[in-house]
């Protein structure tokens, strides 16, 4: 047997009192199955995160079946057994295992204790379920999962290194060096202050030497003024560093976010993306306010400890003993603290997503009489988030109380022992006062150091959340060839195009080949759900096909570069949106230089010019992101005008005239046809189909 095989067998042995099941929250709306597998793998020693699983197993936004989860588990080296069982039989399951929950979700059953069931829910965290609730939501299907013969204990997690983040900031090293030097001066003064007090009490007062007293006081005043000036300069340098980090980190992450593929956004909620982006602020705040403090606290702990040994001898070991007790308590409770922190972040993000979703659909909410229901659901989510915050605050208060108690006990013991040494003439009063001052600094610095180190561990949580965005591969690849911007009408061709939502599902379309000549108009028809919109997104470069190619003028769009390709085409999709600004800005795409004549011509072609001119402010009329004050047909015509303004070589239209009356639709179709643009449209209306050169059914 090789050493590697022996280590694998040892890793499979459970030699601890109890193996912990980690809590992993799902990021995408339909990856609860992956999260459950990640939790169980972590329990058995294979530490993997959702980023790794998502890359290896491309699941659909529509979710996974139990059979799909079973297949993924086997690829991870796990053995499985699917069971159909009654509620009373849950006690005999090998835990942790996966339960099918409420016919639309998967959770991990951790343990069964009498009539209480402990679940790790990827959507809600740790839950303690009663028998009645379990009976209501458990569907009777479970999946036992345990290490198979090919299972390996390993760590497959994705992180962003702090070094790479720091090196990405221009001017940060020089600023850090300046802050460090200023901090050394401040901390040196802090060490000198108790020495000055000791000199006054042991030399100036007993000798009645006012000259020495004045000299020491003047020196202390000088050091105080120097400390104040240095502290102000350090605060300004910290502000400069914070600004540098804030601008460069946020701009870099936002630019990366905008370049991620569309599928990234379709599988996530906006509130969760916002929450992950906000985690960057938490990292920045921790780095700018705590890293320098951590370095100086470390130096001061050593320096103060040396001073205590010089002044107090064995009393120093008493201080170290009480300090160790506090550190031990913090370390023991760290796991629970991190779990509550993650729970708080996830619940806040869920409430924010629900809030934005409600506002985006406010008209539907009102018409369907859902105001009370949506309000109650949001309130419940917000209360869950607040309760998590209360748990976190409660733990902070507990730690503060423990620190106060330990420090007080330490102070009393040192007072009793130190006073005894003074009485026995083994220590002067000045030395005792100085030692007490050093003891206070030591306890304060160690508590701060412990909090920072644990906070740094908590930062790994924010690191994971940011990594989900920052380490996701961008859709843009470096173009291999240069393309002239204005190419006129463009030919479109596909060769053997195939696409599926994930590796577990059947293809939406397979080996699809079609060609559209320059200036030709083609309509794509088919039954609802046949994949027309998905095909359109593949043709537009929003989705990458599993196989096959999309070519324009005989050139693969991947050679051109997705961004370059998007500059050559225009799309009007079913779910298009307007942005906050004027109608002029929306039609012109918020360009710095706007072509007034061309804008009006595009508005006339989309049959919206007269409507705009009848508005009090004309093209300067302000609209919001939801397009308030405009009908559905008016919005669609503005979308079409916006697409035409780009002077595209190909115009893609997905039910782009579905909200128009027949007269307006006919006018728009004829106007666009006369522009000699290659058109690919999805439509069902006969009036639209009559204006195209060819119809393709899928």
UniProtKB/Swiss-Prot annotation:
Residues 176-458 form the ABC transmembrane type-1 domain. One of its GO terms (molecular function) is ATP hydrolysis activity. Keywords: ATP-binding, Bacteriocin transport, Cell membrane, Hydrolase, Membrane, Nucleotide-binding, Plasmid, Protease, Protein transport, Thiol protease, Translocase, Transmembrane, Transmembrane helix, Transport. Its main location: membrane. ATP binds at residues 526-533. Residues 26-145 form the Peptidase C39 domain. It is a multi-pass membrane protein. Involved, in conjunction with CvaA, in the secretion of colicin V. Belongs to the ABC transporter superfamily. Colicin V exporter (TC 3.A.1.110.2) family. This is Colicin V secretion/processing ATP-binding protein CvaB.
